[in-house]
Every structure is written in C-alpha cells, then in structure tokens.
Amino acid sequence: LRQYCDDNGALLVFDCVQTGMGRTGDWFGYEYSGIKPDAITLAKGLGGGLPLGAMIALGPASQLFAAGDHGSTFGGNPVATAAALAVISAIEKEKILAHVDEVGEFLLTELALIPGVIEVRGAGLLIGLTLEKPVAKLVVKKCQELGALINAPGDTTIRLAPALNISMKQAQKFVAIFGKALKEVNHV
C-alpha cells in the first residue's frame, strides 16, 4: 500500500478516528502494521468526550498546508483542545498504553477459551469475536441483563471497545458474564 501510493504520487491517509489515542495499545492503530502514512485522522478519544477532530500530516505531507490555507468554522475550540491536552497527559502519566496492552491480551486469551467462540481478533481494547452460532443479538441482550454492554454488528459477530481504563478485575468480571450469557443463549 505504501509502495503503491509512492509509485502513483498519492498520499496515504489512515483513519485513526476509532483506533487512535491508545485504543489498540499504541498511540495510533496503524503503528502495529509498520506502514508509515502521510497523514492520519483523529477524533472520538482525542477530545475525551468533547467534539474534536484532527488531521496530522507527517514528513513531506506536513509541508502541503501553510497557515491560512484551510479554515474551519468550529476549529480550534479552546475547551475541546484543553480536553485533548488532558487526555494526552493522562495517557502518558497513567501509562494507559501498557495497561491497554495488558488487559487486551487478557481478554483476547480468555475469551478464546469460551465454548461457542470460534475466533477472537483485535488489538488492545478493540476486539472482535466470531460466534459459532448466529446468536450475537441474544448474547448482547443477555449480557445487558447481567450488567455488561456490548455490541453485535452481525449475527455471529460481537464487538468490544471498553473504556481504556477498565480494570483487570472488571475485565475478569466481563469474561465471566460473557461466558455465562453465551452458555445460556446456546442452551435455549
């Protein structure tokens, strides 16, 4: 992909709106791939709950915009940018990246051991599960009854994106809840 863009004079832009700000255990989701983009986009976690987006250009691409070339009606909101600075500071001071790696590895390992789960994939705290049977929506409902919120984007697919500061104890509790929910749904 990098070579194709270089050969054709195209910028390689990675969308890190969901995978940025530590979600995958790295600052940006592309980092584990080893591919270097020309620019990345950020939002969601960047503002810590406040509306904020950004584009970061790297290397020669960073010279393509000069002051005044681009404007935004809502750009540069001081409250949202202060929140972003607080988010960045918290990620660094609280060693969130290492924590996300540790809890993510625990979840990937433990969820793969649950009967009825045929695949677990992901990085950090962005995890997808494939179920043996098309019961994902029922599992979501049962998990909610048991105290856990999850998402089912497909009949056999579960998506997990817990808070980056989820404790190991909370992760352990979730594994137990998920296992119980899947077992109950599969035996209906």
Predicted regions and their residues:
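Conserved N-terminal phosphate-binding loop of PLP-dependent enzymes in the Aspartate aminotransferase
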Residues: 1-188
